[in-house]
């Protein structure tokens, strides 16, 4: 355990950030999974709605600093490409 006061504060801050990041990443996985399930079911309308939601959540994660903008762009591109095949 740290002895320096500022390091004790950083430990608490880092833990809060870790939990927040974990929650956001979990939500991202959930919405992308929902998109893939809609795609697998062949429901184009539901897939488009899920695509829009996933894109929104990915952009939100970038703005919060959870993921890098290029990673979000790659993921959005991949799911958009999959949606275009239907």
Swiss-Prot record:
Family matches, as Pfam families: Ribosomal_S20p
Entry GO terms, CC: cytosol; small ribosomal subunit
Listed GO MF terms: small ribosomal subunit rRNA binding; structural constituent of ribosome
Protein keywords: Ribonucleoprotein, Ribosomal protein, RNA-binding, rRNA-binding
InterPro entries in the cross-refs: Ribosomal_bS20 (IPR002583), Ribosomal_bS20_sf (IPR036510)
GO BP, sorted A to Z: translation
Protein purpose: Binds directly to 16S ribosomal RNA.
PANTHER family in the record: 30S RIBOSOMAL PROTEIN S20, SMALL RIBOSOMAL SUBUNIT PROTEIN BS20C
Similarity section: Belongs to the bacterial ribosomal protein bS20 family.
UniProt name for this protein: Small ribosomal subunit protein bS20
Source organism of this protein record: Kineococcus radiotolerans (strain ATCC BAA-149 / DSM 14245 / SRS30216)
């Amino acid at each position: 355990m740290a002895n320096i006061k500022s390091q004790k504060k950083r430990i608490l801050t880092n833990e809060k950030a870790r939990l927040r990041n974990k929650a956001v990443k979990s939500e991202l996985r959930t919405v992308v999974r929902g998109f893939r399930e809609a795609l697998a079911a062949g429901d184009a309308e539901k897939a488009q709605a899920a695509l829009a939601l996933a894109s929104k959540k990915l952009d939100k994660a970038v703005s919060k600093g959870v993921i890098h903008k290029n990673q979000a762009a790659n993921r959005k591109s991949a799911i958009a490409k999959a949606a275009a095949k239907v």
